[in-house]
Amino acid sequence: MIREYFRLHQTIATIVARSQEHIEIAKSAIIDSRTQLEEFIAFDPLFQLTLVPYDLPVDNAPPIVKRMCHASSLFHVGPMAAVAGAIAAFAVEAMVEAGADYAVVDNGGDIAIFSDEPLLVGIYAGSSPIKNLALEIHPTGGILGVCSSSGTIGPSISFGCADVATVISRDPAIADAGATALGNAVTPDASLKECFSVVDRDEVIGALIIRGDEMAVWGEVPPIRRARVKYDLITKG
């Protein structure tokens, strides 16, 4: 298996595939997606700044912009809440179209997966005492998004205090926007069980929250197992 780190402006990704050809295809897809996105932001800077769903002013917006707008509208967050998952999704879709049977793009903790074999996705919750756990992902039969948000780790905007809020969806852009919304819902006094109401949609397969020494799951979450999580493999800047 080939694992390659790839950075382009704010996009910091780890790409995993069985062939270098598919790695290069993923890089090209990331470059194309970012180029389209940056050109649209230059046309309408509000798209990058708004924290609420965005109504497209034009019909010919690029596919990544339309996808981000749709995903974010489901959870009442801004479109940039879906950017990492959308970029990862387009990259894995391009790999699969080129014949890849194993394709993973981890875009800063927002992961798009297409796999014909089981794999583990580590759960990183920062300073929480809940450590060394992973989701056991079985052959996906399609692309799967496993995306996370945190109010205590990393530079992304979150209005909550979850150490990690993870959402699983068939569309990584939807998983990303959902993770942002779920993370925002986790306040110090909130019932974790009640927080899941913000992602209770048909498009969401399951979700997980860790806050301090508490963990809660909702929906059809893959098996959680003990694992020696290799924190040096976490995609970060």
Swiss-Prot record:
Q: Which InterPro entries match?
A: ApbE-like_sf, MA1715-like, UPF0280
Cystine pairs annotated here are: none
Name the HAMAP family on file. UPF0280
Q: Which family does it belong to?
A: Belongs to the UPF0280 family.
Q: What is this protein called?
A: UPF0280 protein Mthe_1297
